[in-house]
Amino acid sequence: MSKGNEEGQAIPPEGQDGERAQEKRLSRGKFIAAAGAAGAGLVAAGAPAAMAKSWSKGSRNKALTANQHAPGMIGGPTGFPGAARYQYPANSEEGRAVLAARALRKAGKAPDTLVVQALNFARPQFENKFPAGATASIAGIWERETGIKLKFVETNPASEYATNIRNASTKNGSFDLVTGAIEDTGDYAEAGLLRPLDDYVHKYRPSWNDPKYGYAGGKPTVQLFTQYNGRTYWVAFDNDTQPYVYRSDLFNNPREKAAFENKYGQPLTVPKTWDDQAKIAEFFNRPKASTPLYGSVERKCPFWGIVNWEHRFLCSADPNMFYFKPDGSANVNNTAGIRAAEEHLRSLGWSEPGALSKDWLAQYQLFGAGNGVQGGTFPNVTKLIQPANKTLDKGFGKYLKTDVQPGRMVNGKLVRRTVIFYIISYGVNAFAPKSHHEAAYLFLQWAGGARMYTYLTANPGGYQDPHHTISFNDPLVIQEYQPQPVRALKEIIPRSAPGITIRGAPQYNQALDQELQKMLTKQQSPEQAMKNTERRWNQITKRLGTERQAKAIRASYAAFPTKGRYGPNSPIK
């Protein structure tokens, strides 16, 4: 990042600082602010009062109906009410990217087409027009503004890792942009598949650390979402910070509240600690009721279940309990690891029949049918379980609220940690033609910029979730995810921690997963599960090179929440 300007800012116009100054300059008679969406139940929201005053009746109607950009904006979507919210000036992360890509194309230094590897459920958000009236999709806007086409090649979560490890070994340069999860970062970087992006980040200054346009949670979130071993490899296109979901109608029922307090001697409220969570799970677990209730429906199945051990483990120290010690050795065969395993096992008793083989979709079905009381899951739970989606919502989606995962009291402080699980990311394929690299990065900065990415995540066509601060005030995002869960995300992201992202992450995760599954199927005790995990993790580290792994482990600590990020101490309203 350049010195003398805030990170993510261009050279300040008229002696002012960055993108916020640019907005102020344009708003004085030139900038047409974000319009509230009309039509399908949307209301005006999120536009600063000073900008709203700049509307005249004529200019407002013109901007809302014409297929053109608002004054001062050089690009972005058009054709629908509120499109100006996602348009951008030249002095913005999107503006810098699109102007640079256009210049590269004109100079013959960019390809005719960028080939983008994308997950099957992410691709539609790039290619589907949204909302009604939009003149182009995300891909169409990019081509219109730069002259560079996009070609998508699909993969899926089940095969993406193996495919890309094979791409690395064969040095496959037939595609320009790599997709993956942050758990894959270490392996992809060490295999040479991902090109480090720091030179482009320095040159084009994305606004990731900007207080207004940046990632919610600031610098630790940026490091968590984009970096490995101190270098930038990804641009984040997702937010799989796991919220804690609960049935608000049950928690607010006067009869249930009175019965709970009578039994446990404390009020029924959203659990702040894992001890609270266990009491609530026990209380509401009613498998033989006319509508069966299961008290704790976070996942226990292979792959999807390990995150629920991680939530419990990480909150055992202030500010975090780490998976590995600074010397690279495993840090799980201890009180924190064993307790997390014991709680994970105990929770199985409050789960639905067959829980050991049921994934997140089965969990969504439980919530939608009114059978699930509480449990951690993905942010799009309230986006998908809505009345319009009769496949999932059987009348209970309206009661689903979210909060930060429960935690523990540590030295008088309430430590609550949510773990990022998966998160779709994109990087530049190091084996693609070098002449494609810069344009490939510029597409990521543009599509992953605060304005354009907010627009992308509001599109109901896919599962890429919001993580920029401004996204949480956007009417279309709020409409899709629901108001309370969007407010909760603002609190969840700053308290989010990574899973294992160093080289060999899939091997470490598989070892933990297998030992937890043996425990859940009563083949071994929680103590033995952690002892075996420690042994296997240390073997993996030794095989990959202890000194090298330890260096990456120490660097990874910067991606965890910092000291002082406690609570919240009351439910998020």
Task: Specify the residue positions occupied by each region the protein language model found.
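Short helix-initiation/N-cap motifs at beta->coil->alpha
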Residues: 154-164, 272-276, 355-369
